């Protein structure tokens, strides 16, 4: 059987190794494509650990969920949804015809591979909220120092947000958010202190949307801030809270009084909460945003043969991207 070079994970919570793996089989509705660039996103690590709700729990496996690849007809495309145990950290993969999005002229494959997954995580709820309200006021981002958070700042402003407030602990990440015009709040890990700091930054203006990439204590601090902030025109306060990630903890304590005292809607945003049609409709839209450099995606590039080094690299605010070699 023919084989290819790939990143191979033999057990959960391990480190992928560079080696030979059987070539993917060509099945109906799929075509063979060659990897050009693929991002190591947090969800890639979570799926590989076997602990994510969407993990298939089968090893050995090739990690990776999305890619920029070149098809046999020469087209440069963004794709994903590779059938396990295959993934995108491989020389070749069988991509579904329904998930074939040609890159716009001038698009940098590394930027697209690094930015589509983290960028869409905020782009989808932002455009949905703007459609509801017609315009975006204040947007609060919990976990602004990571790649998804920094892209959320840029996404919010590109959609006309009046203010963006970002919270986090990493000083360099907060500086990068501030350079992108976000107002920042440095978290201490103390719920009361952090809640007061967020409330002070709100001032009298309630957020129309909260994008939460971390959950845990930062979410609890935000709940407290929403509870005792003195917003003007309280009859018009309408808050949408989107839980996207749980880097700071799987659980958070939600005061019942907050649900009674504020008009607030708390929901999740993930693989099971948005329709596939809604997600796919925004793929070319967001790719165009990246191609036009309207959002910047900080990346660090590794050859596939250095997958162990790439996997170990987890630089805040910079996405590791695997390329052939």
Which functions belong to the PLM regions below?
Residues 2, 230-231, 276-325:
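C-terminal hydrophobic helical "lid"/dimerization subdomain
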Residues 115-191:
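Mid-domain Rossmann-like dinucleotide-binding core that forms the NAD(H)/NADP(H) cofactor-binding site
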Residues 65-66, 76-144:
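NAD(P)H dinucleotide-binding glycine-rich loop of Rossmann-like/cofactor-binding domains
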Residues 3, 135-138, 161, 207, ...:
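Phosphate-coordination loops involved in phosphoryl transfer and adenosine-cofactor binding
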Residues 157-231, 284:
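Adenosine-nucleotide cofactor-binding segment
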Residues 215-292, 325:
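Glycine-rich phosphate-binding loop and adjacent beta-alpha segment
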Residues 22-41, 48-87:
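Glycine-rich beta-strand-centered segment in the early N-terminal region that forms part
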Residues 88-89, 168-176, 251-256:
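Short, glycine/polar-rich helix-capping loops at beta-to-alpha or helix-loop-helix junctions
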């Amino acid at each position: 059987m023919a084989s290819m070079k790939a990143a191979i994970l033999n057990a959960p919570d391990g480190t992928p190794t560079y080696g030979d793996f059987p070539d993917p089989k060509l099945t109906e509705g799929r075509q063979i494509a060659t990897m050009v660039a693929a991002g190591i996103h947090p969800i890639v690590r979570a799926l590989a650990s076997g602990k994510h709700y969407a993990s298939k729990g089968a090893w050995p496996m090739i990690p990776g969920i999305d890619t920029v690849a070149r098809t046999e007809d020469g087209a440069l495309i963004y794709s994903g949804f590779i059938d396990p145990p295959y993934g995108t950290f491989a020389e070749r993969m069988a991509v579904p015809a329904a998930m074939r999005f040609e890159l716009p002229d001038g698009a940098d494959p590394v930027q697209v591979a690094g930015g589509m997954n983290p960028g869409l995580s905020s782009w989808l709820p932002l455009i949905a909220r703007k459609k509801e309200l017609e315009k975006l006021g204040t947007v609060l981002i919990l976990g602004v120092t990571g790649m998804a958070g920094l892209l959320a700042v840029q996404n919010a402003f590109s959609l006309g947000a009046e203010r963006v407030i970002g919270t986090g602990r990493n000083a360099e990440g907060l500086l990068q958010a501030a350079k992108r015009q976000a107002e920042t709040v440095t978290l201490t890990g103390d719920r009361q202190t952090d809640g007061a700091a967020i409330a002070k930054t709100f001032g009298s203006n309630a957020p129309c949307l909260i994008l939460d990439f971390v959950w845990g204590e930062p979410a609890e601090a935000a709940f407290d801030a929403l509870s005792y902030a003195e917003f003007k025109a309280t009859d018009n306060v309408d808050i949408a809270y989107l839980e996207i990630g749980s880097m700071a903890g799987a659980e958070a304590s939600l005061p019942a009084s907050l649900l009674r005292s504020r008009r607030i809607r708390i929901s999740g945003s993930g693989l099971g909460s948005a329709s596939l049609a809604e997600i796919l409709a925004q793929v070319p839209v967001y790719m165009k945003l990246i191609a036009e450099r309207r959002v910047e995606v900080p990346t660090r590039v590794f050859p596939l043969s250095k997958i162990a080094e790439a996997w170990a690299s987890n630089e805040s605010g910079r996405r590791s991207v695997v390329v052939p070699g």
